[in-house]
Swiss-Prot record:
Gene Ontology terms: biological process: phospholipid biosynthetic process
Entry protein name: Glycerol-3-phosphate acyltransferase
Location of this chain's protein in the cell: Cell inner membrane
Family to which the UniProt record says this protein belongs: Belongs to the PlsY family.
HAMAP family (alphabetical): PlsY
Entry EC number(s): 2.3.1.275
Catalytic activity: an acyl phosphate + sn-glycerol 3-phosphate = a 1-acyl-sn-glycero-3-phosphate + phosphate
GO cellular component assignments: plasma membrane
Amino acid sequence: MNFLNFSMLVFAYLLGSINSAIIVCYIFRLPSPRSVGSGNPGTTNVLRIGGNVPAIITLAFDILKGLVPVVLAKVLTGNEFITACTALYAILGHIFPIFFGFKGGKGVATLIGTLFGFSWILGLIFVVTWLCVAVITRYSSLSALVATVIASFSVIFTSDLQVATPFLIIAIIILVKHKGNIQRLISGQESKIGDKAKAKNDSN
């Protein structure tokens, strides 16, 4: 691996480590997303805590954290596998941020950015899948999980297995991070889109 490729991976991880949910809640003087609602510092929890504006800002920045390094890797390296690995490192930064004690979000919004950066078709597959499941079920977590699996596996059909492997690893990590959501979906206790945040120990 040359210096450029290594630099792209480091840049992706460090950018991914900037947790916008925590920063946005601090700027808007909202409770920390790590102590309210689901306890997850991500877009959905910010939406429950502070409403549309903070959530949109959080979502936009988290998407950019995935989009920017992947586009740069694509342009600068011209290597699909390195670009896919850059996507993986951006996700790892978001989920295990060095700046926040390695305790971050669940990676879905950043995944959207990496998918659009890698191929707009993959990004579109994710968004359409998410919207369809969300409209039918009103479960943000279920929508994210289904969209993550479908979009990540779709890389196999747009590239080869080696290039798809980092995205398949991303899908596995995101599924594991949503273990609690999956358990609550099964038990019927998962919050739906539009539900207000509660104290962490009373919430999903």
